[in-house]
Structure formats: structure tokens, C-alpha cells
């Protein structure tokens, strides 16, 4: 029996993100690349994270900090909040919330919310950059608990 995919898609890992992490397939859209990159963080697959970061940004220079981030974080779940096209067909955005526990900081559940930008080059999507999004205290918590942020992950 196969394990559930860490990206929280509801699919089995071998039918979801595994083909991307093993380079048997390439992501056809930004949201799929986002899910596979999240799974790479969970699985500590730094090589995949580097391979899917836009090469113009020289991602190899981030290898050590990516490896440290993977090692020091326990990823708990991913929620895709929104997807939107960019100014051209080769640009797209994915807003997500990822829950994690940082083992070096507080040992409490944190939520990282980001609007990531992806570019397609030579028929492959790449992560290019992202902007962290603040969740308002009275907004619904991005973890999908149904509670306000201040009563949930924002405590």
C-alpha cells in the first residue's frame, strides 16, 4: 500500500508527486510544481528544489540553507489558497499556506503564507520568487480549521 502524498492532495504519493521528484514527469502548471516542491521539503529532496528553481537565480548557492531548512522543519500540511495567471501565458502565481514546526525556534506550529511566482521556460515551470502574505488576526486561519487566525495558528 502506497503512502498518502505529503502535499495534501488526497492522492497516493506514487500517483501524485513522486513522478516529479524522480524526474519521470514535469509539472504541467504552477500549482502542480508548488505541490511537488512542498513534498520535496517534506522529503528533504534538496536536489529537486534546486532543479525546479529558475536557473537564472543561481539556486545552487542556496543548497546549504535549503538543506538546513529541510532538516530543522517538520512540515505538517499544505493548503493551496489561490492560483492566478501572470501577465503572459508563461507566468503564473500560487498562493499557499504551509504549516510546520521549526525545531530550532519555538517548537510550536507556524504558518507560512506566500504568493509564489512561477515562470515557464523551454516548456518547464520554475519557481522564481515569492512574497510572504500576512494573515489578519480576524481572517479565517489558512490551515482550514474554520477558526479565526488569532484563535488558531496565530496564537
UniProtKB/Swiss-Prot annotation:
Q: NCBIfam families from the entry?
A: PRK01617.1, PRK01752.1
Q: Which stretches are annotated as coiled coil?
A: none
Please report which protein family the annotation says this sequence is part of. Belongs to the UPF0225 family.
* The protein's name: UPF0225 protein PC1_1977
* Pfam families assigned to the protein according to its UniProt record, in alphabetical order: SEC-C, YchJ_M-like
